Design a protein with these regions (language model features):
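Active-site gating loops and adjacent loop-to-helix segments of metal-dependent hydrolytic enzymes
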Residues: 80-112, 146-161, 166-167, 225-252, ...
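N-terminal metal-binding scaffold of metallo-dependent hydrolase/deaminase domains
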Residues: 1-50
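Acidic, glycine-enriched loop/beta-strand segments at the rims
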Residues: 10-23, 286-287, 353-390
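C-terminal cap of metal-dependent C-N hydrolases
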Residues: 370-427
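Alpha-helical scaffold segments that flank or form the walls of functional sites
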Residues: 82-148, 169-182, 430-439
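His/Asp/Glu-enriched, well-ordered alpha-helical/loop segment
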Residues: 245-252, 294-380, 396-398
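Metal-coordinating catalytic core of metallo-dependent amide/deamination hydrolases
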Residues: 138-259
Length: 439
């Protein structure tokens, strides 16, 4: 299918990968951006097709075109748990509220919870994500229905490779890998849960398995002070040092949280090219603190932006996360220039693409990349007066401005209508699940 997005203000990367806004014609053919032509240079550049030969034309009037947003850390199935463990300390929230509910969940519960999360993602402009979930096959089926792009993992737990639960979950992971090996939109990775749930021997085994099958690692690390203290007491090192010692970082790794980290930890992350997926809202809401993002950026660590799950955030809306990441570090550092709007936008686009290992495929509006794009309505109070679009994205937008979502050249939402999911059915089923599982 040939799609032309005509005369639209477009957020583009320049040669320094700093975002600029230019009016462009954007040409999509099948799943790929064929050309991005600035309107003032239209006569000088040959377009791949015209508005007369396009199969579909989208007007750029009052619209801003962005690369699709990338959520670097999520638990999409948790959306039905929104509000069931608020204002609790991390350990009480996780062990007394979340894990007991998860133990009762069926495959259908996982699928419906995942559908709700995917719906929220589409409506707020997320087109790709890195997720840790329960029951990977029903989760994958929901993602296929929705049409989003994702890397999925099962939280792997246990004392070692002979642990019964570890065997079951690794088997599930490998079955999902086999199913989605040729799938263009879904990739399966290894998900050692955290150092308090996935012990060193199991981490070592997962590292070897990931290396053998060329799989990425998705893991929670150094999320709370207690996690770090317990790890040092048990293993004599920090969670990041433990993961490195176990060999996990020999594989491309996404380390979620990394709130309580030493300079030695940061050196390990940089040396091993580990991406940090920072989740500022979840970290603050659970009382875990603020990750030292400016120090990470100074060390040239790739930092991408995530939401965590709706049980701890309580939203998967990346515009909310963008606002917080840009504001919290200005306040903590007492420096207004700390984490600019453009830096925050980079974290949820190009840095997220790098976290996924897809920096040459997605994350920016460029010819040759996959057509993962979103259009925002700028004829809204949050954009007025329309003088600095990127600042508006960070400081005044709330996600309701997202009008159209395209993934892999397929229109998933247009004029705020999601085409791939049944919203009313999803709402109905999730309210039933919440009532049953939280009695």
């Amino acid at each position: 299918m040939k799609i032309l997005i005509k005369e639209v203000l477009t957020v583009l990367p320049d040669q320094r990968k700093i975002f600029t806004v230019q009016e462009c014609n954007v040409y999509i053919e099948d799943d790929t951006i064929k050309a991005v032509i600035e309107t003032e240079k239209k006569k000088e550049t040959r377009a791949p097709f015209s508005d007369k030969t396009a199969d579909y034309v989208i007007s750029g009037k009052d619209r801003l075109l962005l690369p699709g947003l990338i959520n670097a850390h999520s638990h999409i199935y948790m959306n039905f748990m929104r509000g069931c463990g608020d204002d609790l300390a991390f350990d009480d929230w996780l062990f007394k509220r979340i894990f007991p509910i998860e133990d009762k969940m069926t495959d259908e519960d996982v699928k419906w919870g995942t559908r709700l999360g995917l719906l929220e993602m589409i409506e707020s402009g997320t087109t790709a994500f890195i997720d840790m979930n329960l029951n990977m096959l029903p989760c994958g089926e929901a993602i296929e229905e929705a049409g989003l792009r994702g890397i999925i993992s099962r939280g792997l737990v246990g004392a070692g490779p002979d642990d019964e639960e570890a065997i079951r979950r690794i088997k599930e992971t490998m079955e999902a890998r086999e199913k989605y090996l040729e799938n263009e939109l879904i990739e399966v990775c290894m998900g050692p849960h955290a150092p308090y749930s996935c012990e060193e021997k199991l981490q070592q085994y997962i590292a070897e398995l990931a290396g053998e099958y060329n799989m990425k690692i998705n893991m929670h690390l150094s999320e709370s002070r207690k996690e770090v203290a317990d790890c040092k007491k048990k293993y004599g090192c920090s969670p990041i040092e433990l993961a490195n010692r176990a060999g996990l970082f020999k594989n491309r790794t996404i380390a979620a949280h990394c709130v309580h980290v030493s300079e030695e930890d940061l050196d390990i992350l940089y040396k091993n090219r580990v991406t940090v997926a920072t989740n500022p809202v979840s970290n603050m809401k659970l009382g875990n603190g603020v990750s030292p993002i400016p120090r990470m950026l100074k060390k040239k660590i790739n930092v991408a932006l995530g939401t965590d799950g709706a049980a701890s955030n309580n939203t998967l809306n990346m515009f909310h996360e963008l606002s917080v990441i840009t504001l919290i570090h200005k306040g903590v550092s007492e420096q207004a220039q700390c984490i600019s709007a453009k830096e925050g936008l980079r974290m949820m686009t190009t840095a997220g693409a790098k976290a996924m290992g897809k920096e040459y495929e997605i994350g920016s509006v460029e010819a040759g990349k996959k057509a993962d794009l979103i259009l925002l309505n700028t004829n809204t109070a949050s954009f007025m007066p329309r003088n600095d679009y990127i600042a508006s994205l960070a400081y005044s937008c709330n996600g309701s401005e997202v009008d159209t979502v395209i993934v892999n050249g397929r229109i998933l939402m247009e004029k705020r209508e999601v085409k791939t999911l049944d919203k009313e059915k999803i709402f109905y089923e999730n309210e039933k699940i919440f009532e049953r599982l939280t009695k």
